[in-house]
Regions:
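Multi-pass alpha-helical transmembrane bundle typical of ion/small-solute transporters
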Residues: 2-268
Length: 268
């Protein structure tokens, strides 16, 4: 009775052995977090998501994005005759474009939150500024695209709009566009500074740097559009079409770099 029964002793916990290489670190991460990077909406193959349960900050952000979408449709009414029905249909395309832009911003915010799960004061501050911009620019965003599609479809919105007014509208849109993606660049730059605390492996650190580049590209395009609005409001609007090929080339080149590094470190 004076000795302890070793059969009922709790098992000893041993920390994982130190890794001697990046490849070993990748193997340890995959063993400790099986399938972690494949959970949730739009999972990623080479990035382990560090965001756990939905936090109060994420929930608040989702509510604000939902409210912004509500503001897009708050002025819509049920058509009472054929003429009102056709007028409502003309508003479908600008609504769809605005909806797509807000969803794109929400997805970018969702991915950042899932990747890093940061809630330090600086990240919270950037999130609050982002939400302010999203809410503030809902009506300018809707007006700009309603005006554009009205001009393309022969509507009466925008008749009498002068060169100066059109230029001011494009500047307002450019300021919002540039500010939103500059905030995302700052958020990713902050996460990159914390890469050691977040235990980012080489592939995740590379993807974080590439996300900074992508958001800087978006911000630069918006800034150039702002400058072009002083020359030609129309040219300032068409300038945004350079985003397609620019981001396509950037994604193809950087995606190959990520795959090659992942294969080198045996993370695939």
């Amino acid at each position: 009775m004076g000795h302890r029964d070793k059969r009922h002793s709790p098992p000893e916990l041993h920390p994982p052995p130190p890794s001697s290489s990046l490849a070993d670190a990748g193997e340890v991460a995959r063993e400790r977090f099986p399938g972690e990077h494949r959970r949730g909406l739009l999972p990623e193959q080479y990035f382990r998501w560090r965001g756990g349960e939905i936090t109060r900050l994420e929930a608040f952000c989702d509510v604000v994005f939902g409210f912004a979408l509500t503001l897009l449709v708050v002025s819509l009414e049920v058509p009472r005759n054929y003429g009102e029905m056709m007028a409502a249909m003309r508003g479908f395309l600008p609504f769809a474009v605005c909806f797509a832009q807000l969803v794109m911003i929400w997805l970018a915010h969702y991915r950042f939150s899932r990747r890093f799960g940061l809630e330090d004061p600086y990240t919270v501050f950037l999130n609050i500024v982002l939400l302010f911009l999203v809410l503030f620019y809902v009506y300018p965003l809707k007006f700009v695209f309603t005006l554009v599609f009205s001009q393309l479809t022969g509507g009466d919105i925008g008749h009498g709009l002068g060169w100066h007014e059109a230029a001011v509208l494009m500047r307002i849109y450019a300021i919002g566009f540039t500010a939103v993606f500059s905030l995302f660049a700052l958020m990713y730059a902050h996460a990159y500074k914390l890469r050691d605390a977040l235990e980012l492996n080489a592939v995740e650190a590379l993807q974080t740097r590439l996300a900074i580049q992508e958001n800087v590209i978006m911000g630069v395009v918006g800034a150039v559009s702002f400058a072009l609005s002083y020359v030609s409001p129309g040219l300032a609007g068409w300038w945004y079409f350079v985003l397609g090929p620019t981001l396509g080339i950037h994604g193809a080149v950087t995606g190959k770099k990520v795959r090659l590094l992942a294969e080198k470190l045996k993370l695939a």
